[in-house]
Design a protein with these regions (language model features):
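Predominantly single-stranded RNA-binding modules in RNA-associated proteins
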Residues: 1-149
Length: 149
């Protein structure tokens, strides 16, 4: 039996039956803690899904991690730059979310920007390409150069 802390517990409560069915685990919710029990592989997949949900992804997007070659990666912005976090996040998001949307479209990944982290869900190779693009943007590359990755 595994247990994790989840920030978006309301969404999990609403969709508990669907999550249990798709992940093949039994879920118990106490406060903001989610316990789940099942086969070891199912528990591992559930831990990835709950980590993605806690990061801020929707349940529908997080359940894509159930697909075999999909992965979830978190990039910590502070590890790659000393600049002001607000400025770096502005570069990542772009005008009206255009840069983030282009990264998502080109890489075929789901990209979400949190307070000081960037989360990416998608096929393994696509996630690596998106990570390279995001890290280059964080370090100061021009958006046009980043789109080549």
């Amino acid at each position: 039996m595994e247990e994790v802390f989840v920030r978006k517990i309301e969404d999990i409560k609403k969709n508990k039956a669907e999550i249990e069915r798709k992940l093949n685990v039994k879920i118990t919710i106490v406060g903001n803690r989610v316990s789940y029990e099942g086969d070891s592989l199912d528990e591992y997949e559930a831990s990835l899904v709950f980590e993605a949900i806690s990061f801020g992804f929707s349940i529908k997007v997080a359940l894509n991690l159930k697909i075999e070659d999909n992965t979830f990666k978190v990039i910590h912005i502070k590890e790659h730059t000393r600049r002001k976090l607000k400025d770096v996040k502005s570069r990542l998001i772009g005008t009206e979310g255009k840069t983030r949307r282009i990264i998502s479209d080109i890489s075929n990944c789901f990209v979400l920007i949190n307070e000081s982290d960037v989360g990416i869900i998608g096929y393994v190779e696509d996630v690596e390409n998106a990570c390279t693009a995001v890290i280059n943007l964080i370090r100061g590359s021009k958006q046009a150069n980043m789109y080549q990755y």
